[in-house]
Design a protein with these regions (language model features):
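Intrinsically disordered, low-complexity proline/glycine-rich segments
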Residues: 1-172
Length: 172
């Protein structure tokens, strides 16, 4: 019998977000294989996330410049802290980080109290691959929300339900 791989809720070291060119399907990969699978739904500014332990999350707008990761409850959120979208606050029940854009294009840093604890870097021409290196364990939710903001910033800045169809009003 093959043992089932245990899901790690926090990651440390080298990982990559990878997608084929012009694809809405992404994977977060690490040394042990696929950590999460994501699918962008551009028409609604959301992303669906499947974790190896069977849980499913939805990343959805919750106000101008705010994105939340929702499963059976809100797991984490990321909020824009600067007008240009170069600084974001990533938070959850047990963590809080700052995601800041570096002066070098396509380079971002995760910080705690101003101290860098992780780096995220896109390739020279696109974000179809986003390399991640963390010095300390960072929750998967924080990395996935960071990916959502870095790879698709206009979706992160969208207002809730801008493109989602609303249910028809009930007749009285």
């Amino acid at each position: 019998m093959t043992p089932k791989r245990q899901f790690r809720s926090a990651l440390v070291g080298e990982h990559q977000f990878i997608s084929r060119f012009m694809s809405n399907d992404w994977e977060l990969r690490g040394p042990d294989g696929v950590v999460a699978r994501m699918r962008r739904v551009a028409s609604t500014h959301t992303s669906l996330v499947w974790l190896p332990d069977g849980r499913k999350l939805e990343l959805e707008p919750a106000g101008w410049g705010t994105v939340v990761a929702v499963g059976d409850s809100e797991k984490a959120k990321i909020e824009r802290q600067s007008w240009w979208g170069r600084r974001w606050e990533v938070s959850g029940a047990t963590f809080g980080y700052e995601l800041t854009s570096d002066p070098t294009p396509r380079r971002w840093t995760l910080r705690i109290g101003g101290h860098p604890i992780g780096r995220l870097a896109g390739t020279a021409w696109s974000y179809n691959r986003l390399d991640v290196h963390t010095d300390v364990a960072v929750p998967v939710h924080a990395l996935i929300l960071s990916w959502h903001v870095i790879a698709r910033p206009w979706e992160a800045a969208a207002a809730p339900r801008v493109l989602k169809p609303l249910a028809a009003p009930k007749a009285l």
